Amino acid sequence: MNIHEYQAKEIFRKYGVPTPRGGVAFTGPEARRVAEELGGNLWVVKAQIHAGGRGKAGGVKLAKSLDEVEKIAEEMLGMTLVTHQTGPEGKVVKKVYIEEGADIKDELYLGMVLDRALEMPVMMASTEGGMEIEEVAEKTPEKIIKVAIDPAIGFQPFHARKLAFGLGLPKDEQREFIKFASALYNVYMDNDAEMIEINPLIKTGDGKFLALDAKMGFDDNALYKHPEIAEMRDLDEEEPTEVEAKKYGLSYIKLDGNVGCMVNGAGLAMATMDIIKHEGGEPANFLDVGGGANPDTVAKGFEIILSDPNVKSIFVNIFGGIVRCDRIANGILQATEKVEVNVPVIVRLDGTNAEEAAEILRNANIKNIIPAENLKDGAKKAVAAAKGEL
């Protein structure tokens, strides 16, 4: 789960991670009031969407008067912001964050992620603040300094010193940086975050460090421990079909291809997408119906997959362990009665009661339900069907 910049900064401040003062607004007059309360003569108006690259897309603007704050906010609210992370459809701006202007001496990058290879959190820093970190990693990876942190000992001063030396910070700034980085580590660990990114982390004229931007992502499986963070979820920023799928216990992620996938188990779902690619196709989604699949969840799965107009075929790939294949076969037939399935459905069922399942599908004699002998055969048929070649 991701949250907005203003929400991430609220969490930062609770842990003593310094940020500029600011407030959220939903209308132009509200934005003006926030700027008035902040005082000063320079403000930044920032579109609040779950995507990076806002500045380049016109979603971050400076204002030098209260009138300008109101005008920029009114122009920004309701606009569709298209960045490299939103896709071509973009995201509609429904709120803006008004922040006091800052005295920027230098821009840095600081972030934390979980390194799955090392099985440890990693803190990363770079002198290339303000740039896309993916671009820095691709073109000048030597400019990214990393430290892996063993949770058993936690974040230590030597971790921060390594980052500070790599950033070339003078001695009089290192103590302030160590304090900042230590607080950020606590934010990450205490809240079960998956990712934190501050880009840019700025140095001010008086040698202070401020989080000028803030991104946070959380482990959905840990949200039950953090109800106050779960309340920050903005469903408007999420794919509607993904939200709908969660209500039925389905794990669904929309992709850009045309071969719909319905699979039980995340590992098998990933393998299914891989083999579709291998056969020359493009998966339209990731959909894990889980171990407790029943006719209702299968029907809902079809409904969600078919809500994507790009889907030209569906590959149902089920390995029956806990869930019986005959139950899935009956679920598929019941689903076709509830939902208009107007594309070829290639079905590969293996495992518990697979033969009974094959018999059920054969006896049903439904034209667009096509059995597959194995995984490879199923993927080939699904890709061919999507291309209109089956």
UniProtKB/Swiss-Prot annotation:
Catalysis performed (reactions): succinate + ATP + CoA = succinyl-CoA + ADP + phosphate; GTP + succinate + CoA = succinyl-CoA + GDP + phosphate
Cofactor(s) in the UniProt record: Mg(2+)
Domain of life: Bacteria
Binding-site residues for ATP, renumbered to this chain: 46, 53-55, 99, 102, 107
Signal sequence interval, chain numbering: none
Binding site for Mg(2+): 199, 213
EC number: 6.2.1.5
Start and end residues of each ATP-grasp domain: 9-244
Database matches in SUPFAM superfamilies: Glutathione synthetase ATP-binding domain-like, Succinyl-CoA synthetase domains
Gene Ontology biological process: succinyl-CoA metabolic process; tricarboxylic acid cycle
Pfam families xref list: ATP-grasp_2 (PF08442), Ligase_CoA (PF00549)
Keyword annotations of the record: ATP-binding, Ligase, Magnesium, Metal-binding, Nucleotide-binding, Tricarboxylic acid cycle
Annotated residues for binding of substrate: 264, 321-323
Assembly description: Heterotetramer of two alpha and two beta subunits.
Similarity field: Belongs to the succinate/malate CoA ligase beta subunit family.
Protein name: Succinate--CoA ligase [ADP-forming] subunit beta
Organism: Nautilia profundicola (strain ATCC BAA-1463 / DSM 18972 / AmH)
